[in-house]
């Protein structure tokens, strides 16, 4: 996971102090890219422990098209609690946009189903894109999408994914984002009879919150360990059939967790 540590190091050295929506303040850069070869292991940060259960359940929650945190709470996941209303609703966030982007009236588009069909039928297409940035729905969302658009690319029997993330909390959020979209790439590749290729992570505003700087410096003192392997149940060929029990992470031996406050 050297690319992730290099990003953190770059922001600590070259980041600009900026104010932000939360009032916390950040060190920020604009424009950066990381690449991960998914054939070399599953890109899960090893210089601190990541909560893999949260990553898997959140992704399954997105893929369900769900926007209520009830499913997450039932599975012991609290990462969206701060933004939900009293009934657990978040508005038309990621799951809604991925699975039922509203066109007009009762019509909607299932972008996940559409892109999988494109990968299978027209793998050389340059239109294999999913967007969560629905301008007409932004004011209804509890939190505007941070990871806004991703595109797939097929070559030599391998599926790659590139994510554009407009806003990135490097210390807390980015390890989740890397793992989540890498896992989604593995899942879709399996459903399309392809091998995983690369995950490419492109950023707009990538930042370290000012109350995360000490934690970031601590993390940079730790030596990365070998990447784990994520095994998927090979019998699953439909993206909506995956369940938590269909994922097994092998050889994950991270350094201890590092706690940091969430900026809301």
Swiss-Prot record:
Its EC number is 2.1.1.45. InterPro entries: Thymidate_synth/dCMP_Mease (IPR045097), Thymidate_synth/dCMP_Mease_dom (IPR023451), Thymidate_synth/dCMP_Mease_sf (IPR036926), Thymidylate_synthase (IPR000398), Thymidylate_synthase_AS (IPR020940). PANTHER family: THYMIDYLATE SYNTHASE, THYMIDYLATE SYNTHASE 1. GO terms for cellular component: cytosol. Pfam families: Thymidylat_synt. Catalyzes the reductive methylation of 2'-deoxyuridine-5'-monophosphate (dUMP) to 2'-deoxythymidine-5'-monophosphate (dTMP) while utilizing 5,10-methylenetetrahydrofolate (mTHF) as the methyl donor and reductant in the reaction, yielding dihydrofolate (DHF) as a by-product. This enzymatic reaction provides an intracellular de novo source of dTMP, an essential precursor for DNA biosynthesis. Keywords: Cytoplasm, Methyltransferase, Nucleotide biosynthesis, Transferase. (6R)-5,10-methylene-5,6,7,8-tetrahydrofolate binds at residues 51, 169, 263. Its main location: cytoplasm. Pathway: Pyrimidine metabolism; dTTP biosynthesis. It comes from the Bacteria. This is Thymidylate synthase. The active site is at 146 (nucleophile).
């Amino acid at each position: 996971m050297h690319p992730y540590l290099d990003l953190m190091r770059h922001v600590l050295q070259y980041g600009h102090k900026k104010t932000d929506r939360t009032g916390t303040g950040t060190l920020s850069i604009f424009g950066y890219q990381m690449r991960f070869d998914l054939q070399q292991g599953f890109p899960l940060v090893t210089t601190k422990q990541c909560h893999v259960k949260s990553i898997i359940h959140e992704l399954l929650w997105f893929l369900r098209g769900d926007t209520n945190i009830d499913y997450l709470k039932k599975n012991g996941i609290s990462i969206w609690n701060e933004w939900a209303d009293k009934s657990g609703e978040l508005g038309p966030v990621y799951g809604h946009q991925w699975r039922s982007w509203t066109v007009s009236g009762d019509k909607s588009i299932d972008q996940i189903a559409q892109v999988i069909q494109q990968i299978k039928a027209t793998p050389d297409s340059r239109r294999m894109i999913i967007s969560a940035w629905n301008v007409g729905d932004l004011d209804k969302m509890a939190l505007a999408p941070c990871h806004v658009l991703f595109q797939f690319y097929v070559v030599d029997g391998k599926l790659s994914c590139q994510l554009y993330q407009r806003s990135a909390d490097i210390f807390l959020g980015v390890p989740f984002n890397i793992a989540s979209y890498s896992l989604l790439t593995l899942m879709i590749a399996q459903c399309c009879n392809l091998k995983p290729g690369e995950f490419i992570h492109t950023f707009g505003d990538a930042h370290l919150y000012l109350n995360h700087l000490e934690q970031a410096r601590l993390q940079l003192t730790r030596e990365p360990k070998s990447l784990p392997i994520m095994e998927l149940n090979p019998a699953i060929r439909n993206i909506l059939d995956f369940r938590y029990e269909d994922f097994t992470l092998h050889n994950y031996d991270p350094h201890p967790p590092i706690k940091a406050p969430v900026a809301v």
